[in-house]
């Protein structure tokens, strides 16, 4: 009869493998902050914005940086049915202009042109990377 009770006690105790550590670790997990790159930020201080940097072929009439490598990563990581806009700052500026001018699109035409140019530059970079065989766009 004592054998039966000992078997029940053994069945009630959990089986712990010998190689595992049963003490709880209390060390906090530190999460590394991603490094910020200069190309990640949009300059909001108007005194520091230089649209003519690099010569005539590099003129830029919008605050965004559509040629940034971060856009390639964000574009490839989005879900197929989701929308990603690399020129969000220009889009928001054109929409704010519409709100200020009571939906008068002709008053905000320069903002819309800047947004269109930003989108063209982004897709031009995407096509050029495709021609050059650069990977990372999700194809």
Swiss-Prot record:
Entries under InterPro entries matching the protein: COX23, Cys_alpha_HP_mot_SF
Placement of sequence motif Cx9C motif 2: 108-118
Residue ranges occupied by any CHCH domain in the UniProt entry: 84-126
Disulfide bonds: 87-118, 97-108
UniProt-listed GO biological process terms: mitochondrial cytochrome c oxidase assembly
Region (Disordered): 1-40
Subcellular compartments: Mitochondrion intermembrane space
GO cellular component: mitochondrial intermembrane space
Compositionally biased residues, Basic and acidic residues: 1-12
Domain of life of the organism encoding this protein: Eukaryota
Biased composition (Low complexity): 13-35
Keywords recorded for this protein, A-Z: Disulfide bond, Mitochondrion, Transit peptide
Role this protein plays: Required for the assembly of cytochrome c oxidase.
Family per similarity comment: Belongs to the COX23 family.
Protein name: Cytochrome c oxidase-assembly factor COX23, mitochondrial
Provenance organism: Candida albicans (strain SC5314 / ATCC MYA-2876)
Species lineage: Eukaryota, Fungi, Dikarya, Ascomycota, Saccharomycotina
Gene: COX23
